[in-house]
Amino acid sequence: MKKTLLACLVFLSLNVLASKPKHQFVRISTDRGSCVVLLYNQTPQHRDNFVKITQEGKLSGTLFHRVIKGFMIQGGDPDSKTAKPGQALGDGDWGYTVPAEFRDSLFHKKGVIAAARDDNPLKASSACQFYLAQGKVFTDEQLDLLEQNRLKRKIPTWQREVYKTLGGIPHLDQNYTVFGEVVQGIELIDTVAAVKTGAADRPVEDVRMTVTVLKKKEAKKLEKKLRLATQP
């Protein structure tokens, strides 16, 4: 009897584990639209931290406080929750950083989410401030000049093709940790990037966000749709 019960418990436990999605997703919602972001398993410290602060409600209610068309939209500053109109933002944090997790395969194509940071030698990331990359489309000539004058390295051929079609921000590669990408609603980036801004690139009209972690059922459904279930 005990062996049968133990076997049943093991079977149920395996089923529960098997039913868990292999990836974490978050939804960023604003009054101008929403998007869903896949958090990369290749950057586990950033993934886990972003899930943690999202579940704790630390991101919901913050603003996209820095918006530069053709570059990126930045948010997550805790000070922005109660910021007055025109107040300078960008220095708020939660008192800790996340170690850099640079990966050669993860780069600043349009639609990625990456961690903002201050000017520190280890390039450690802010625990809360992040940006969604918009960037621009490049030509081969522009990428060649960027390699020679700024990067001092070669951009992999397959990444060049992405920068020439989808676009992005290649000069930020290996300087700011990329830890996910928008898989639904990428048009939100263009919408927010187009808003009127004032001093310090802050939108004249607040763009406030609500950030939530997708529940297991929805995450598994999205994995299947994106054919991610068998990927790391």
Indicate residue ranges for each PLM-predicted region.
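Cyclophilin-like peptidyl-prolyl cis-trans isomerases
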Residues: 16-232
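Sec-dependent N-terminal signal peptides
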Residues: 4-12
